[in-house]
A protein has these predicted regions:
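Conserved beta-strand signature within the Rossmann-like core of class I S-adenosyl-L-methionine
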Residues: 170, 174-187
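Conserved S-adenosyl-L-methionine
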Residues: 261-270
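Class I SAM-dependent methyltransferase SAM/SAH-binding core
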Residues: 32-137
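Core SAM-dependent methyltransferase catalytic element
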Residues: 269-285
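Class I SAM-dependent methyltransferase Rossmann-like catalytic core
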Residues: 1-36, 41
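A short, conserved alpha-helix within the catalytic core of class I
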Residues: 158-174
Length: 285
């Protein structure tokens, strides 16, 4: 299911309008390192790292259930199909072969840069179980690097008491800046997107085959013959929207953590989809 979420995020880029705010937040807090929580398959934080002009030096991804192939899966990209000579000649008066070579070199350079700046913590990270300056994973305690904590499309997985516990632990024990973003909400546009999810899954499946090389016959059978996958993806999206937290509820939670300065709001993203953002940073005394 995370494959479909990743593909949808790459195509529609719903979080891109918020990247400027995140970049400014990092600058204000003088941060060049990010620890992404509940990363799953990566998604938006990888896009942010790729398009940000070198402010972010290192990104650590983490999850309670990290992918077994982690970084290889995250950084896998496939060169786009080459454009025809005729299209290049119509677009610009230069050698099409020179443009093709330049485009391919740019792709390889970006991929190499991404691989060198992104790491996936191999240990399972349970963000609800903290010790001072560390996180607990079953019986293993290990230090989490310093840096801004980010979360994308993750907050709706937690209840209000859990969100408060998470924020308070980060504020009192980590003392690191926090940025959380959600495209799931109870807004009508969000439910409209959920309604067309089955159609999107039908179109995204060939993309998974071409771009991520997910060549499993079961995926096609459970998508086109017996549409179990579209049903589960749709239900997952619906439940996520229903479990999302409103701005008012989050403001009430964060008001109980006066040690941090909090900024909570909504930015309009692609297709007018609302993006909820939460920024928290240690209060200057």
């Amino acid at each position: 299911m995370t494959d479909y979420i990743r593909a949808a995020l790459e195509i529609w880029k719903p979080y891109h309008p918020i990247f400027k705010k995140l970049d400014n937040f990092l600058a204000v807090n003088k941060q060049t390192q990010i620890i992404d929580l509940c990363s799953g398959s990566g998604g938006p934080i990888l896009a942010f790292t790729a398009q940000t002009n070198s402010r972010v030096r290192q990104v650590f991804l983490s999850d309670k259930f990290p992918p077994s192939n982690s970084i290889n899966y995250l950084t896998h990209t496939k060169d786009p199909p080459k454009k025809t000579c005729a299209r290049y000649f119509r677009a610009k008066r230069e050698s099409p072969f020179k443009s093709i070579i330049s485009e391919k070199n740019d792709i390889l350079a970006n991929k190499t840069a991404l691989q060198s700046s992104v790491s996936y913590l191999p240990q399972p990270v349970d963000i609800l179980r903290y010790q001072p300056s560390s996180m607990l994973t079953s019986d293993i305690s290990f230090n989490i690097p310093f840096g801004t904590r980010t979360m994308f499309t993750a907050l709706h997985h937690f209840s209000a008491p859990q969100v408060y516990r998470l924020f308070r632990n980060i504020a009192l024990k980590d003392r690191m800046p926090l940025a959380s973003f959600e495209v799931t909400s109870k807004h009508p546009i969000s439910f409209l997107m959920i309604a067309i999810t089955p159609v999107l899954v039908f179109f995204l499946t060939p993309l998974l085959l071409w771009r991520y090389k997910e060549r499993r016959i079961s995926r096609f059978i459970l998508t086109y013959c017996l549409p179990v996958v579209p049903l589960f993806v749709t239900l997952d999206g619906l439940i996520s929207c229903m479990n999302s937290h409103s701005n008012n509820s989050l403001k009430k939670l964060t008001s109980r953590i006066p040690e941090y300065d909090w900024t909570i709001g909504v930015e309009r993203g692609a297709w007018l989809l609302p993006i909820q953002y939460i920024f928290g940073s240690p209060r200057q005394v």
